[in-house]
């Protein structure tokens, strides 16, 4: 199980069933008891999770694709005209990754009472998004980073 968590966290998806297993994990409440139960899965348990997660994963990607299609627009972030979408933080990784294809990077944002949060994603061919995030006081990794701006910032008003 831990290998699948790492596989998704590092956005490698090299282990068979990672997306499906993680879909099952994400469908449960985040409690220590539930995590203990999920982490104790043996090989048969992982196979069952893979089967159960296939439909969840299919629905997730269908929803992400449809939302990106209707929500995507362009915005200048860090001097780069890139695709963006206003989506819940739970969809940021998959949605921004999809929009980043053929682009320097892509962003998803979600508003809170305090300001606007941005999640940036880039493909291997894209820019180092941690450098972009640092311009706004954020940080992260080369291909996944983020930052937050206050409600009166120009990026929060467009």
Segment roles from a protein language model:
Residues 1-48:
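Internal, active-site/partner-interface "lid" segment
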Residues 61-158:
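Gly/His-enriched, cation/cofactor- and phosphate-binding structural elements
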Residues 22-25, 47-56, 87-92:
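Short N-terminal helix-initiation segments at or just after the protein's N-terminus
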Residues 32-78:
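Electropositive nucleic-acid-contacting surfaces
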């Amino acid at each position: 199980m831990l290998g699948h968590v790492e596989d998704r966290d590092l956005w490698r998806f090299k282990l068979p069933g990672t997306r499906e297993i993680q879909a099952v994990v994400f469908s449960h409440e985040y409690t220590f008891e539930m995590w203990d139960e999920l982490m104790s899965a043996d090989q048969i348990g992982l196979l069952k999770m893979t089967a159960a997660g296939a439909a969840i994963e299919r629905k997730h990607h269908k929803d992400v694709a449809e939302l990106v299609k209707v929500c995507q627009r362009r915005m200048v972030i860090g001097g780069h005209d890139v695709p963006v979408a206003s989506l819940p933080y739970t969809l940021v990784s998959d949605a921004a990754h999809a929009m980043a294809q053929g682009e320097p990077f892509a962003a998803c944002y979600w508003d809170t009472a305090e300001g606007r949060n941005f999640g940036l994603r880039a493909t291997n061919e894209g820019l180092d998004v941690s450098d972009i995030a640092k311009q706004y006081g954020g940080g992260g990794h080369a291909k996944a980073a983020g930052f937050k701006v206050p409600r009166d910032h120009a990026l929060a008003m467009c």
